[in-house]
């Protein structure tokens, strides 16, 4: 039992000698990863916003093309001689 106690005391002694010097490079590495992560996050938000705008615009253009096509069909469609709307 005394051996376990002495090993614990020795381990605590060693832990007081080396903790800060071994942890410093890890923290500096994390801070650079955090900044890269935040830049990546910002670019993803921007891309998502642009993609949402493009998606909404594409949806509106498709709806307009469908509306024009239905009007063309109502006005006689292929038998009217007018070309179908391009969209």
Curated annotation (Swiss-Prot):
Residues with Serine amide modification: 86
Pfam family, one: Hormone_2
MF annotations from Gene Ontology: hormone activity; toxin activity
Signal sequence range: 1-23
UniProt entry keywords in alphabetical sequence: Amidation, Cleavage on pair of basic residues, G-protein coupled receptor impairing toxin, Hypotensive agent, Pharmaceutical, Secreted, Signal, Toxin
Gene3D superfamilies found in the cross-reference section: 6.10.250.590
Annotated protein name in UniProt: Exendin-4
Organism, as annotated: Heloderma suspectum
